Amino acid sequence: MRATFSSRLVAIVAALAITVVVPALAGRPGGSAYGAGVSQQAVGAAAQAAAVRYWTTGRMTRELIRQPPPGTRLAWLSGDTAGAGLRWTHGGPVAAAVGRIFFSLGGTDYVCSGALVGGAHPDVVLTAAHCVTGGPGRGRATQWAANWMFVPGFADGRLPYGEYTAHRFLVSPGWTAPSGGEADDFAFVQVTPATPGEGPGAAKPPPGLSVEFASSQGMAALTRSYVFGYPAEPPYTGLYPAFCAGRVTASGGQVGMPCGMTAGDSGGPWLAGFRPRRGTGQVTAVTTYKMSGDLAVLYGAVLGPQARALYQRALRSAR
C-alpha cells in the first residue's frame, strides 16, 4: 500500500497485480514548470518506443481475466444507475474516446482511465494528475510516469483504434506544489498514435469528447452526470468500460456521486448533458478518489478556469 494524500483518501488507480493503491510521491527528479499555470514533462521518441515494446497484449491483460458482471438493457435510460457500475455496451463517441491507461511508476505497473478530448482529430487525453505523476509535490521533486500508454476503446484485450504514447504531460502547478490537493488532480497529455487499430475502420481515429469548463473551480456545470472508466478490482476486470449515472453534489472544486466502480477508474470522465442513446455529452470533471470510510461514493475534480488554461495550452502546443 502506497502513501495517501491524506489518511482518509483512497485513489482509484490500480496496480496490475489488482491491489488498491494510491499514488506516492517519488524521490527521483522529474518535471519542470514553464509559463503561468502549467507544470509539464516532455517524453522523447526513445521513451515512446519503449512504451510500445513494454505493453504487449499479454502484459495488458495479465491477471485481469475474470467474469464481468451482467450487462443491462436500456431500461436504465429512464432512471439513475448510481452505485451500479454497469458495463457500457451501447457504443457512441464515448465508447471510442474513453480508454484505458497503462503506465509504470517507481518500478510498479499501474492502470488508470482517460478520454480523448478536442474534436475531430484529437491528440490530447484528459486523465487524473496522479495517473501521470507520483502525487502532490509536497515541496519535493515530482516523479513522472514511464511506459505511459493510452488505448481508446479498449475492450476484452482488443485495441480497436490502436495505441497512443505520451508526448508531453501537463498538470496544474497546484498539484505539484507543497499544498497540492485533490481539486488539482487533473492532467492533459499530448499523445501520438503509436500502433494501428484492429478491425474495420480502424485507420480512422475516434473523435475527442467535448469539454465544458465550470465558471469557477467550485461549481459543476450540471447536477447530473454519467461517469465512465475501467474499474479493475472485483467484481470488475478492467477489460471493458463501465459507467455510473446519477445526481452529483459539488463542493470545493470537487463532485461526488454514489458509484460502485473500483480501482482503475481514476482519470475517467464525468459527462454532463449526456445522451445515452447517442453516447454524447460534455466532460465537466475527472475521477480522482474515494474516501476510505465510504467506498460507495466516487469523487472527481471539477474542470474549472485553471483546467481550461491548461487545456488550451495543451491544444496549442500539440498543434
Each language-model region and where it sits:
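C-terminal cap/linker of serine protease catalytic domains
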Residues: T284-R319
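Loop/turn elements at helix/coil->beta-strand transitions in domains of secreted/extracellular proteins
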Residues: A96, H121-D123, A221-R224, G252-G253, ...
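Protease-domain processing segments flanking chymotrypsin-fold serine proteases, especially trypsin-like
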Residues: R2-A3, V10, V22-G119
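Acidic glycine-/aspartate-rich tracts in secreted/extracellular proteins
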Residues: C131-V132, F154-R158, P193-P196, P231-E233, ...
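Chymotrypsin/trypsin-fold serine protease catalytic domain
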Residues: A166, E182-P258
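Catalytic nucleophile loop of clan PA
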Residues: G260-V286
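Terminal peptide-recognition signature
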Residues: T56, I101, G114, D123, ...
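Conserved catalytic-core segment of clan PA serine endopeptidases
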Residues: A84-D109, V117-G118, G139-E198
